[in-house]
């Protein structure tokens, strides 16, 4: 039996260069208790795909959104109701549509990758980011000299979570949501692949607006790194699933989760 008014949405940011899903966040929207909780799934998490051990971001590469959602659902023991995949151009367009975002860049960023034609140069501190700037900030892993977050992908996920919260705040501000709904719809049609209708999205936006941006929170699935994979912690992951993500009335058990060791 499912809880009423509770939905799970897998949000994926696609890497245009390698065809994989670079960012995966499972979002629970609880319209009854009034909260939104997003959990980042490290892209190097170990998963079994086609009977072989792989990194989870390979699932999109192999079978698109459907296989990615099935893999996440199998691992966490809960259904993925909806999927939203956005490519890099869509991310940039959305940030520009809301007039850019003021964001506290967490560290000095100094990175160049001539192969990807990517240069990332920002000073630590609050600054106004355009769509192109924002994309550079959320893609950053480490500096040219190897310094940076200390834990590349985990540090990057924390920055992405903070940035998404800043975007939600700006998108849901009364001025933006009312005057820019047509802009949002165009961006969704052009750059976003989803099984949500525009009506679904508008309804969800209204529900989140009622909750307020302070009811949006994020964390990362509890994990440990052991080359070449990130391993999800079964006990802590189960607790997190039951606390925030589980759409069922009954708690999930250890048997419901399938986390490769």
Roles of regions detected by a PLM:
Residues 1-261:
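Non-catalytic, solvent-exposed segments at the cell envelope interface
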């Amino acid at each position: 039996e499912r809880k009423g008014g509770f939905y799970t949405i897998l949000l994926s940011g696609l890497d245009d260069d390698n065809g994989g899903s670079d960012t995966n966040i499972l979002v629970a929207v609880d319209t009854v208790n009034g909260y939104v909780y997003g959990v980042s799934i490290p892209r190097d998490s170990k998963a079994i795909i086609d009977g072989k051990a792989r990194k989870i971001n390979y699932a999109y590469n192999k079978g698109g959104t459907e296989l990615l959602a099935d893999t996440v659902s199998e691992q966490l023991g809960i259904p993925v109701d909806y999927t939203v995949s956005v490519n890099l151009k869509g991310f940039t367009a959305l940030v520009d549509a809301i007039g850019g975002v003021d964001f506290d860049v967490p560290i000095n960023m100094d990175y160049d990758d001539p192969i990807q034609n990517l240069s990332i140069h920002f000073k630590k501190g609050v600054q106004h980011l355009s769509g192109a700037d924002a994309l550079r900030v959320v893609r950053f892993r480490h500096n040219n000299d190897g310094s940076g977050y200390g834990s590349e992908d985990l540090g990057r996920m924390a920055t992405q979570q903070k940035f998404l919260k800043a975007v939600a705040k700006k998108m849901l501000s009364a001025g933006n949501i009312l005057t820019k709904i047509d802009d949002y719809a165009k961006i969704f049609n052009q750059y976003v692949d989803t099984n949500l209708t525009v009506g679904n999205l508008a309804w969800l936006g209204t529900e989140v607006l009622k909750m307020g941006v302070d009811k949006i929170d994020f964390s990362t699935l509890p994990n440990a790194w052991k080359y070449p994979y990130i391993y999800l912690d079964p006990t802590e992951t189960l607790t997190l699933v039951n606390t925030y993500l589980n759409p069922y009335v009954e708690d999930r058990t250890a048997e419901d989760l399938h986390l490769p060791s």
